[in-house]
Amino acid sequence: MNIQALLSEKVSQAMIAAGAPADCEPQVRQSAKVQFGDYQANGMMAVAKKLGMAPRQLAEQVLTHLDLSGIASKVEIAGPGFINIFLEPAFLAEQVQQALTSDRLGVSQPTRQTIVVDYSAPNVAKEMHVGHLRSTIIGDAAVRTLEFLGHHVIRANHVGDWGTQFGMLIAWLEKQQQENAGDMALADLEGFYRDAKKHYDEDETFAERARNYVVKLQSGDTYFREMWRKLVDITMTQNQITYDRLNVTLTRDDVMGESLYNPMLPGIVADLKAKGLAVESEGATVVFLDEFKNKEGDPMGVIIQKKDGGYLYTTTDIACAKYRYETLHADRVLYYIDSRQHQHLMQAWTIVRKAGYVPDSVPLEHHMFGMMLGKDGKPFKTRTGGTVKLADLLDEALERARRLVAEKNPDMPADELEKLANAVGIGAVKYADLSKNRTTDYIFDWDNMLAFEGNTAPYMQYAYTRVLSVFRKADIDEQALASAPVIISEDREAQLAARLLQFEETLTVVAREGTPHVMCAYLYDVAGLFSGFYEHCPILSAENDAVRNSRLKLAQLTAKTLKLGLDTLGIETVERM
């Protein structure tokens, strides 16, 4: 259940009855402090101004029409006109009981949409590096959340699998008589790529051959297509190993590389010309956009076809958006691409809208993110200043977690230790990123992310096992517990119950904004509230069976919420630590 939505509807009806316009916003929010109740309606200020009355006067009139019987134990006006709402313990108890009867913990399903999520997007013939981490794991958390809510989600891995680099690579492989790319590891291909680029820059004969090979590849020549396909296959096979290690849901079936849109590009350029949006300028085909200005203050020109006939990333992105609407039938498209690409995407989408390829009713959303930085505040690099390979980062995470787990569990069997180290190490890397607001840069710090205190994966995983340990210690009759009533009589019980029942509200925010850090903060809060509840409200030594069973049910909902919440983030839970 979404209590915030329920209260918003009730307060809105009362505001309208008090004379507010039909489109008034009640602005019901979760209260920041317990003394302000569980929820606060802050919409009186804006509406009172429109009505020409004092906000407190409007709030008083709203209260005369507000019926929250059976939901709130107390409703009061605070300050200039805020309405504080304190939830009824019996209502909380009833909702906890309801949540425990469903695998979804009472979370309702919104209207089902088809949502395309563009994320990860590594380049072919290059190993994934830390720069791919944020897009991959933030995008995957969004996918998991949207799917849990019941949407039809299409994962789109926009792989860089087209362009002049393939002419270079094939030409260099051929020169080295190593055409059988299937026998090569990706690390070899990276070395070949560097050598090919060096020769391309320094040897005009080689560069000319590479350009010719690109033309042959683009024209569909069988030999060159086969070589290209091998390069793609090797890359994606290697990347799949990384995806599996990261516990993300991407597979080979989700690859929708740049090459997919290639056949659409000539038609798009012709159509934009026919619509008068694109014009010839100095031999190139350009769209001038009034929405963007150059240094002189004139409309900015966006090239969609070069003088030599080649296409640009913008052209591909126009085709991509068109395809996602017309072919995939998207109701919404989310792009997890770093913030440096924002203007480029905005320009492509402006052209898309002007051309009528995607209607305004279908949102195209750039869920941008900042950079991963080292402790020195500079982009995260190796000690020698090189790019950190993602596989190396995960290896180090596993090794550090292995030492940490072995230190705390010296007698743990090797296979169990390895499984636990993997959950802790990979979870730590992912959670450290996901727990930060994606729009900002963040400092990558091994010590912080592997700590058992604070908002970290190890702490959250431990918090989950701590709740489970209560059930291991208790001799529980599952059927008796299922039929036992929930009784909320202590403040800490009420606070924990109210927060647990805000799970759906949290999921809704993550789904709408693409901000997994909101889920991390929520789960950390739940873990903290359970800790206080556990300390002050004895469970196994409760004064009677009714209280004991009720508190066990609160613990049960806590465990289920932590597990399900961490699952939406792609963080593995463990039974023991």
Curated annotation (Swiss-Prot):
Residues spanned by motif 'HIGH' region: 124-132
Keywords for the protein's UniProt record, in alphabetical order: Aminoacyl-tRNA synthetase, ATP-binding, Cytoplasm, Ligase, Nucleotide-binding, Protein biosynthesis
Entry's Gene Ontology cellular component terms: cytoplasm
UniProt-listed InterPro entries: aa-tRNA-synth_I_CS, Arg-tRNA-ligase, Arg-tRNA-synth_N, Arg-tRNA-synth_N_sf, ArgRS_core, DALR_anticod-bd, Rossmann-like_a/b/a_fold, tRNAsynth_Ia_anticodon-bd
Cellular location(s): Cytoplasm
A GO biological process held by the record: arginyl-tRNA aminoacylation
Family according to the record: Belongs to the class-I aminoacyl-tRNA synthetase family.
Record's protein name: Arginine--tRNA ligase
The organism of origin for this protein: Salmonella typhi
Organism ancestry: Bacteria, Pseudomonadati, Pseudomonadota, Gammaproteobacteria, Enterobacterales
